[in-house]
């Protein structure tokens, strides 16, 4: 017999401490010797001392995993050598197997340092069969349960085949040796047969094909130990339904419970009478306290809805199921939604049941949890179109439309997909003119496009894909179907949606140019093989890829995708991509190229990269405007009676074609002229406008004589819109003699009558585009406009419509309409004459007229009898043309500061529509970079607007600008703070800032801070506010209000930074303030005195702290309540309120007149103490040199308002 030679101490003690490394070394030596010994030759007594040492707590429960692993390896070797009698007591074996179970969990991580030792432990337990020692332990059943649980956990998470084999062998050994298999172990075992992954995979999927390793392990156990398990399986099926519920928890059900419900489903389908005493118990399960129980019951009953009629056979169970739609658990609500629609597939379902289910789905579209909303949308998407038509209402579908603007991205994406699918199914009804379907579904494309205002790139991309593939079906080879879908959608577009659609078409040109340049770079790059200029070519390719990536929601993926495409150097793919956006391509060529391109690149690009590539191809492809479509549009316009349903959409598309693709329009311009000639005086303004747009973009363009004669008639006797477009075409294309003849005809017949507005519209265009010919009669026209129109007043005061605040332009009385158009003619003369020698002499009285209109509230009549609507329109017109002149640097230099203040107060006009329309115009001009930076502060005056719509509109736009400038690292919006403080210091209410109006000025500044300032730019803004206190006001010397506002802004920034944890670090750079309004204080002592002085009162500080800590909505009420004189959208003030408002305004005017007696006799409505002071704001970007009517054109930059929000 061979004795164990190892005699060294392996147990650390207080007297004989051992380091961890020393213990590991000795254990390795011991393990090596034990492994080399044979069971037949070992002297059993020689290993007993080592056995006693190995079960010492200092080794078996050592904190080091390596020591525990090697200790257990030694122990299992001892079990091998001493088998069948273990050299350990039962208590020691119990401790050993507890540690073994813990250490075996390490089999999940094959990268573990001690994985080989753990593997050896498992292997020895299997081969030596030492695991059967567990059955002799007092708590053998508990050990068996833990082993089942551990091994199946390991199997689910993935192990090697050898590990699975050893685990199978060990479990089989235990099953065959133990006296009684515990129920808990059987529960674990049965659960694996179902799938072991949760209710969704288990209920109703007893023969699932998705069998993982855990299932395989369980199946093999049943196969190898079938005789032993047979009795337990029978007993389980007999007792499970009645005995298992007491062991259920709120978060987890037992596998037996799940399996029993699968059994119920099978019996319900094939033998429902066997469940007469079981199904009623589902009522209790559906209302059980445990969430897990309710989940299983909900899914079980939901799946049962597919067969038979549970609502009639078991009405109480059906009622309990419907009640789970409002379950407190999100998971239960989702499950109920997902399975409730099964009732709609059951032929036994009555109309009452179907209606009930539909109402259940509708109600969950507004659930408080996003997961529930997503689940509802997915479920609805799966319903048939007939179900929608028969059971859903327009209001229910509009609730789905509301989810397009959901705060959560996942909900928006699912709503986009669902609504697109619904519209696609409804198309045939819509094209057939089914009225009910039109009411139900026609709004969907419009709502989808309006999603662009959510300002999320991922959402935008989803809309574009769904519009292209489902709504408009751009990939359809049938031109007529494709156009019908396009016209049908446009027919029901809202104004917002139409604007987005046109901007998307406009953006297509940008993307096609970008991809065209990208392809050129790819060709030069030649897959990385270049002979010359390698660095330059590579840099160009990198730059264009960076630009493309910046327009994606996933720049990293986009960069990798287009880099991969370039490296492939597939010349055929380059050709196909070019053909998708070539204006020479027929649509069939475009379609064929797209399909071929996608098929070709799918072989090399991943699925994610292909999706990324697809969206850019869709954005650049000529889907809407291509040669095939344009010829079809012209054909449609030639037969208006036949195609009357799609006449307006086709006209709308044709109107924008010359703006976006003038070359394509040029091929059909003769056909457009023929349409105008054939229609005569009834010509559609949109068709004429399209020709007008083309004439402004096409050099040396001329029209046919017959077309010119028709346009001439329209200039004299058409509608205003017809005259406007016709006059533009004539001014650009016709001969000097033709234009002079028409001008003479108009001027000789100028008189105030019902036809004057049309002639004034014509004159306005002629002054703008052909000033040289009109200038000879300009003074005569101006005299007529001033004396016979502008100075023409109502004969008597008409109080009939005294309460009316607004009306559309078309409903204006003739006199007001003529005055508006007269102002337009005068301003257009100035716009055309900009830079000329006489421009200032001509412009001075016109600019003065605009200013007087603003100061006088639009009232020019000495009898004060101008109707409210007329005054409102005149104020709006004056402000609108002031902005036009400010966008021209030549005139901007000569518009004084007091006029600027007057313009700013339009944001606080008493009329809601004036404020709203002026704000829209202001935003557009700023968006196009046509106004100086000093006009940004006007937007923040909406902070105290009583109408939430105005404030929201301004807030959204400001935030979009902030986001845009941050992308380009532009500090424009931060610099605006200086202009805002300066403007507020000249606000008419500034004199009462220390009393009743302090909250207003806090609101202005807080509005700026809330919309512009963040943790990154707060140091810059704070620095600017401090710099203001080192400067003096150029406009009004001694203006200390600017310092009060500076301190107020600093305090607001400090309080907000403290509340939000922002760091107010010192800004390291020195920023120059705008020199035209603020200049450094020359005296050092004076500068120091002002800088150190606190200009705000303790009361103001308290108000600021309270304001910042108060929700915006609550604080807004405190400010807007004081502005009740501002007319809200749908609210009319009482007569007493109006009188009070007039008194306040008159008092304000009196005070301002006292400050500047030079203008006392001039009618005004706000501060004028800065009259005559001119400020040069020409450093800001201004309009292009080309003269154009902004309302006629859509600039390419317009898309930034949506794309860069």
Curated annotation (Swiss-Prot):
Q: Where in the cell is it found?
A: Nucleus; Chromosome, Centromere
* Any one GO BP annotation for this protein: cell division
Q: Report the transmembrane regions from the record.
A: none
Polar residues compositional bias, start-end:
1111-1123
Q: Where is the composition biased (Acidic residues)?
A: 1186-1205
Q: Where is this region: Disordered?
A: 1111-1205
The protein depicted here goes by the name: Sister chromatid cohesion protein pds5
